[in-house]
Amino acid sequence: MPTGTSAEPGTDPVLILGGGLIGLALAHELARQGLAATVLSRRRSEAAGFVAAGMLAPHAEGLDGRLLELGQRSLERIPAWVARIESDSGLACGLRICGIVVPFASAAERDAYPTAAHGERLDRSGLEREITGIGPLWRAGLLFPQDGQIDNRRRLMRALERACVHRGVRFEEGCEVLGLVTEPQGQQTGEAPGEQLAAVRLRRADGQELTLPCREAVLCGGAWSSQLLPGLPVFPVKGQMLSLQGPIGALSRVVFGPGTYLVPREDGLLVVGATSEPEAGFGEGLTPAGQRQLQAGIDALLPTATGWPPMERWWGFRPCTTDQAPLLGKGPIGGLWLATGHHRNGVLLAAISAELVAGAMLGQQSDAGLLEAFHWSRFA
């Protein structure tokens, strides 16, 4: 890791501020494009990429507008993106385009769903065909065969980290970024007045504090992003989850119910999520109320799973914005880029976020309009 001395002009690596899924995806893409990248991460284990269920569900989640477009673009790119990660890492990522079923209490609710036109309509018999043992409350449904899942918790994160190493990305784990150092810009270049990123202040795992010069960095700090950039509209939404061990093949589709979803892995593990607790802030730990909510969701969606043995219980923090869409592209400081605020769609949007932000950093103009829709200035 570089010390406080400046590197040769033009050789400074791009600093990735955050080692979660989005940060790793971006570091890998930049390295593929020939740029040096260094990932600064306090504790990668706390990243949302390790605790999410891994759904790829732009249609099942009922997204709309530009966020739906962003999700669809990413979904299209994910097979090739995963193939590159698997090639660079030698590890499988657990991608399954297995389809997602959204159950409803009535056909009217089904037909009013924002993305109903993208799915196959199911009646009660169709629900029973797709989800063996589905609870009696549900009378209609939508099947989105184009949606799916990836095993982020056990496979994708490890594979992506190894792929980054393969591409020469450097890592500094246990490194806390304390602040950004800026300098005036525009005085000599004729650019509009403003601030230019000059360095980051950080504390390494051994306690050493230093100032690391840099001209470009990407803020991928997830729910903690506003701690580095006060005023950035990103806040934590706590989520609790659990997993059960079911029989292999007992459930082939993801089930996306109201307040609860069931994500079956190939080995029979059933990932159950998730509470949504914006009032919890960064409060850690499981709660009886949260676990009761998950259990009630299992009882309603798939009663047969109530007897399956529990495996894990965990929690994490989604990085949310007030419109529940990410912040992508140029930041409010020259040289600082944003890739954060993905809320519950970080796994889905990792591929397109890395592509768009890396492309913009390299001066590529493709999809500039889509990137602009997620610029931070929409909150200004």
Residue ranges and their predicted role:
Residues 31-50:
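Glycine-rich FAD pyrophosphate-binding loop
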Residues 50, 248-334:
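Active-site lid/adjacent beta-loop-alpha segment flanking the redox-cofactor pocket in flavoenzymes
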Residues 143-186, 190-208, 212-215:
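Helical element adjacent to the flavin cofactor pocket in flavoenzyme catalytic cores
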Residues 207-256, 284-287, 304:
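Central helical "cap/lid" subdomain
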Residues 8-20:
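Beta1/beta-strand and adjacent pyrophosphate-binding region of the FAD-binding site
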Residues 54-133, 139, 297:
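Dinucleotide-binding Rossmann-like beta1-alpha1 core, especially the glycine-rich loop
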Residues 153, 308-380:
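C-terminal catalytic lobe of FAD-dependent flavoproteins
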Residues 62-63, 91-102, 124-167, 275-279, ...:
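Helix-loop-beta segment of a Rossmann-like dinucleotide-binding subdomain
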